[in-house]
Curated annotation (Swiss-Prot):
Domain (EamA): residue spans on this chain: 35-110
Chain's gene name: arnE
Domain of life: Bacteria
Membrane topology: Multi-pass membrane protein
Pathway: Bacterial outer membrane biogenesis; lipopolysaccharide biosynthesis
UniProt-recorded name of the protein: Probable 4-amino-4-deoxy-L-arabinose-phosphoundecaprenol flippase subunit ArnE
Alphabetized UniProt keyword annotations: Cell inner membrane, Cell membrane, Lipid A biosynthesis, Lipid biosynthesis, Lipid metabolism, Lipopolysaccharide biosynthesis, Membrane, Transmembrane, Transmembrane helix, Transport
Subunit structure: Heterodimer of ArnE and ArnF.
Entry GO terms, CC: plasma membrane
Family: Belongs to the ArnE family.
UniProt organism field: Klebsiella pneumoniae (strain 342)
Principal place of residence: membrane
NCBIfam families: PRK15051.1
Protein role: Translocates 4-amino-4-deoxy-L-arabinose-phosphoundecaprenol (alpha-L-Ara4N-phosphoundecaprenol) from the cytoplasmic to the periplasmic side of the inner membrane.
A GO BP entry: lipid A biosynthetic process
Length: 112
């Protein structure tokens, strides 16, 4: 698998882990709160663990000075997911910041 694909998947898994943590904080049915929290935190750990393993393979191939800023994709994924899944409001300035992050990632990615 391409190192760049691994990097994107590592970022997506990290984002998924964050989203599972958010879901663990959401209300659940009475009497099922503990199961709800354990399920979502377990999923978070699974996603974050798999993301870390992919991240280690990325670091074997790409200098950390290039790879680490690419994790800024997490801000993009989390913003899109919060907006799309939980209908969280996103201000114009926030969207502008997301756009600038994407531009920065493209600039870094094409400099390798």
């Amino acid at each position: 698998m391409s190192v760049w694909i691994c990097l994107v998947f590592a970022s997506l898994l990290s984002c998924a882990g964050q989203l599972c943590q958010k879901q663990a904080t959401r209300p659940s049915r009475r009497g099922r709160r503990s199961r709800h929290i354990l399920f979502w935190l377990g999923m978070a750990l699974l996603c974050l663990g798999c993301g870390m393993l992919l991240w280690l393979s990325v670091l074997q191939s790409i200098p950390v000075s290039i790879a680490y800023p690419m994790l800024s994709l997490n801000f993009v994924w989390v913003t899109l997911a919060g907006w799309g899944i939980w209908h969280e409001p996103v201000a114009r300035r926030h969207w502008l910041g997301v756009g600038l992050i994407v531009v920065g990632i493209v600039i870094l990615g094409t400099s390798v």
